[in-house]
């Protein structure tokens, strides 16, 4: 049922999130490489072969044209209902790991099979130092030959045009 469906992902600040659509915000005018990106809802890990959902929270999905391509769009559409059902499933207790941080901890995660989020901490009491690295690699066969539409063709900065965003 899910294989073959495409989620429409969009940055939260461009006015296409569920909340922005419900509040009547006008989506930002974007350069072609900044537009929402369609991604398969089900991806197969290129090493383990394990299938997993590739979804984001409602702030990072496009509710103007989606969030699921080919299904009724908008916050009350069939695509939104399916996304909420998938998020409820993916965040069930048996699928959730909560790290209890200790000084010196290092967490390494494979984002190809991971839905993650930040959690609250007491910034007045604790110092938080986070470093993120991204390892480039093969995201899976679903992307073989994919044109990287989020990279400007003219070599300009990826964030060009976002001065007023």
Question: What are these model-predicted stretches?
Answer:
Residues 1-106, 112-165:
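Non-heme Fe(II) oxygenase catalytic core, chiefly the N-lobe of the double-stranded beta-helix
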């Amino acid at each position: 049922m899910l294989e073959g469906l495409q989620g429409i992902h969009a940055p939260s600040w461009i006015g296409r999130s569920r909340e922005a659509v419900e509040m009547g915000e006008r989506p930002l005018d974007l350069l072609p490489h900044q537009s929402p990106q369609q991604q398969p809802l089900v991806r197969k890990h290129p090493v383990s072969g394990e299938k997993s959902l590739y979804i984001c929270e409602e702030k990072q999905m496009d509710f103007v044209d989606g969030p699921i391509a080919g299904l009724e769009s908008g916050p009350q559409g069939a695509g939104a209902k399916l996304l909420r059902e998938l998020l409820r499933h993916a965040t069930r207790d048996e699928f959730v790991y909560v790290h209890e941080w200790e000084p010196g901890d290092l967490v390494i995660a494979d984002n190809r099979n991971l839905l993650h989020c930040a959690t609250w901490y007491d910034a007045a009491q604790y110092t938080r130092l986070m470093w993120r690295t991204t390892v480039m690699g093969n995201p899976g066969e679903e992307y073989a030959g994919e044109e990287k539409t989020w990279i400007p063709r003219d070599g300009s900065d990826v964030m060009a045009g976002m001065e007023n965003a």
